[in-house]
Swiss-Prot record:
Binding-site list for NAD(+): 10-33
Enzyme nomenclature, EC number: 1.1.1.1
UniProt keyword annotations, A-Z: NAD, Oxidoreductase
Active site residues according to the UniProt entry: 151
Annotated protein name in UniProt: Alcohol dehydrogenase 1
GO biological process: alcohol metabolic process
Amino acid sequence: MAIANKNIIFVAGLGGIGFDTSREIVKSGPKNLVILDRIENPAAIAELKALNPNVTVTFYPYDVTVPVAETTKLLQKIFDQLKTVDLLINGAGILDDYQIERTIAVNFTGTVNTTTAIMSFWDKRKGGPGGVIANICSVTGFNAIYQVPVYSASKAAALSSTNSLAKLAPITGVTAYSINPGITKTPLVHKFNSWLDVEPRVAELLLEHPTQTSLQCAQNFVKAIEANQNGAIWKLDLGTLEAIEWTKHWDSHI
């Protein structure tokens, strides 16, 4: 999917990977970039607007843990303004295994709820035009960082739900793929808590491994958007982009 002249909603588009990805998206010339984030950052929005004055960048405060009905109201406002939306990026995430309920609420439930809300506007069974969803998951959805089992499990759940969305595309008209970054230098990984303090130095130890910059990740994210492959499981690690094959150990046959 060419980004040029498209209308894009980016949930958590002002975070570490999110903000660099927003920059790269704006450079590609969408018609509208709507950023939904919990904390307003006027300086960041101003930077995005200055980067490409031909792109309309707007911001709405949004907490992904609100009920689906509240999300639907916000999306109604956006659809009333833009008329059409081509791409939804779900990027909200926290890494802190002290906060068990919130980790699950943000990393998994919030992604599912935002997706459920936008289906009211996209689902072809309701006369919608369809759309594309890109969910930011994590390589920990493939293999856990065992010191942060809550975070890893939440990302595995988000990945699994994204794979299911892709399979449902013939029914809903909505395609989906996952973005799974490896260890990336962002504020998220500089300091975080392991579950029950099983490894107090987990953040420090993790950063001893090879990493990538958030810019490298963002540039490959844009390549994945442009590839627009329904069901793709993209691994963005060490500055590379790779579509991985999901190993099937069981099939429902339905």
